[in-house]
Amino acid sequence: MSASDLTSVQATAPQGRRQILVTSALPYANGQIHIGHLVEYIQTDIWVRTLRMHGHEVYYIGADDTHGTPVMLRAEKEGLTPKQLIDRVWTEHKRDFDSFGVSFDNFYSTDSDENRVLSESIYLALKENGLIAERAIEQAYDPVKEMFLPDRFIKGECPKCHAKDQYGDNCEVCGSTYLPTELLNPYSVVSGATPVRKTSTHYFFRLSDPRCESFLREWVSGLAQPEATNKMREWLGDAGEAKLADWDISRDAPYFGFEIPGAPGKYFYVWLDAPVGYYASFKNLCDREGIDFDAWIRAGSTAEQYHFIGKDILYFHTLFWPAMLEFSGHRTPTNVFAHGFLTVDGAKMSKSRGTFITAQSYIDTGLNPEWLRYYFAAKLNATMEDIDLNLDDFQARVNSDLVGKYVNIASRAAGFLIKRFDGRVQDSAMNHPLVAKLRDAIASIAAHYEGREYSRALRHTMELADEVNAYVDGAKPWELAKDPANAVALHETCSVSLEAFRLLSLALKPVMPRVAEAVEAFFGVAPLAWADAAKPLSSAQPIKAYQHLMTRVDPKQIDALLAANRDSLQADAAGAAAAGATAANAAKDAKNAKANAKAVAANGADDAPISIDDFAKVDLRIAKIVACQAVEGSDKLLQLTLDIGEEKTRNVFSGIKSAYQPEQLVGKLTVMVANLAPRKMKFGLSEGMVLAASAADEKAEPGLYILEPHSGAKPGMRVK
C-alpha cells in the first residue's frame, strides 16, 4: 500500500473499528452482466472482504440503475411494462453476482420509494440553496411518438462525409462530431419520423456557481489516484477560468423515472437519481437491520464512504455527485477509485469473435468463477490502467498458480498426516522458520489488498507458495514415508506444509472466498480473519479428509465459452436494432449500405476488419517526449519534440492542450505514427501523430488520454 493511499484511507477514519460504506457503479437494467462489468465488482468485493477480515463494520451496497429512455423503449419493444423489464433484469443480475461471489449486503433498485424520497429531498435542498435554475432549451422532438429525443435517438446523413444512418452526435464512418441540428435528412430511431425542433423548460444544477467550484477545488486534493486528480483539475481549469458548465438534470415526459416536485411532466434525468440510488439501497438495508442511516450519511459523519467506478464515469462521480451531496447537507465521498477497461486477447470485446463474454455463459460452460476472480486480481492495481484477459495466459496462470503451486501443497501432505498421524499436526512444527516467514508476510499482503494493489499481493503470495513447494521437494515426504524410522521428520514436513497452506489460504481468501470456506472446513476452523495468522493449527484439532479443491482449466472449456458467445455480424446488426431501431429504420439499412460504402472509401474509415497487411503499413513507434510547449495563437495544440531512436528528433503538433500542461508530458513515453506524411501547418511542419484516446461522446465524457507504454519500452521500438 502506498503512503498516499494509506493516508487517504485512514485520514478520516476513527481509531479502531472503522465504519465503511462501499459501492460499485450501478449496472444498467437493460442488458446482461458481462466480464467487463465483473472487473469492477470483483475488484470492489476483494477490497470489501479485506476490510471485513480486519473486523471493520463494512456495508457493500449495490442496485440496478433502472430509469431512462433506453429502458422505456426496450420494454415497449418486448411488450412489457418498464417495471416488468427491470424486475426480470434484476433477477438476472443478482444471479450473476451471486455466481461470482460478489458479496453485496444489499442489492436493490433505483426504482424504489427510498430513492424517490431521497432524490426529491436532495433536489429541494439544492433548490433552497439557489443551485437550481430553469431555462428554455430547444430540442429534437418526435411528432409521432410525441417525445423529445436524446442525441443517440436521432440518425441521419453525416454533414461531413455524407454517410447514411449516422447518430445525432458523431459519425462512425469518418469520426466527425457535430450537433444534431447539423444532420442531413434526420429521422427518429424510435418511429422513423422526421424530428422537429421544439422548445421546453429544463432544470439545471448550477455547477458553475462559485460555491461549487470552490468546494470541488478543495475536495479534489483528497483523491487517492493522481490520474483522477489531474482529470478533475483539467475539468475545473485554472482559478477564475470558470470552465464548469451547469448540468441539465431534467427530461420531458414520456420518461421512465421520478417526476420532479412541482414540475408536472418533468422528470429527473437518470444520472441524478442513479448515484442517489447508493444511499437508497443503504437506506433500505438500514431500515431492515436497524442501522442508523442518518449517522452514516449526514455532514460531518465519521463513517467512511468509497465508490468504485470505471474511469468512463469519473466525471459524474467527482463533479456532480460530491457537489450534490455537499450542498444538500450530506457527507461527501471519502474517495473515489476508478479502474480501467477490459480487453480480451488484446482487443475490444467482440460478439463476432465470441469474446463479448456474458457472466452467465461463463458459468454455463462450467468454468470456475474463482479462476476469473484470481486472474483479474493478478492484473489489477490502484491505477486506471486497462487490463487484458488473455485466454491462453488465463489457462496457464490458473493451472500453474492455483493448481500446480497452491492446491498441490495440501494434496501432497494431507494423506500422509491422516494415514500416519491421525490427522493431527506436530505442534513444534508450527515454529518452523518457513512457517514464521509466511506468518510475518500476511500483514504486508493484507496492506497490498487494502491499497488495491492486488497484483502485488498475489505476486508475493505465489512467491511464498514457490518456497513452500521447494521445501516439500527438498524434504521428499513420499520418500520419508517408506521408512518408519523417519516418522518424526515426516510428521514435521506434513505439519509445516499444511500450516503453510493454511496461511496461503488466508492470503488468498479475499480473492477466492469459496475455496477459503472449503479450506476452513478441511481444517475444522472458524472463518479466517487476518488476526488468525498468529493462531496456528493445533494437534488438538485433527484435519478432515482432504477433498479436491480445484481442477485445471481444460482448453475445451475455453473453446466452448467462445462458441457460446460467438455471434454473426447479422446478429450484431439485430442487436443494434433492438437498442432502438424500428422496422421502418431497418428498411433503410439496405438502401444506405451502398452509400456508406462510398463514404467509407472516400474517407478511408471503416469498422470492418482489416488485414494484417493493412495494419503492417502503419509504422507505430515508441516515442519519448523530450520537450513540449504551448503553441502561441492556438487554444488546442501543443508542440512536441519526440525522440524515436533516429538521429534527429521529430516535431509533432497535437491537439491535447486541454488535457495536459506541457511540463506534465516532458520525459513521458508515448506511441506515435512514424510514417504519416508530414503536414505543413500554420505553426510549422508536423512530422507524425501521437496516439490519444477519448470517449465517443466527448461532450458527456470530456477528456483526452495519451497512450503510455509500460516502463522498459525504449524510443524507436516498433509497436506490433
Curated annotation (Swiss-Prot):
Record text on cofactor binding: Binds 1 zinc ion per subunit.
Record domain tRNA-binding: where: 614-720
Residues that hold ATP according to the record: 351
Motif 'KMSKS' region per UniProt: ranges: 348-352
Main localization category: cytoplasm
GO annotation, cellular component aspect: cytosol
PROSITE patterns: AA_TRNA_LIGASE_I, TRBD
Transmembrane segments: none
Name assigned to this protein: Methionine--tRNA ligase
Organism per entry: Burkholderia ambifaria (strain ATCC BAA-244 / DSM 16087 / CCUG 44356 / LMG 19182 / AMMD) (Burkholderia cepacia (strain AMMD))
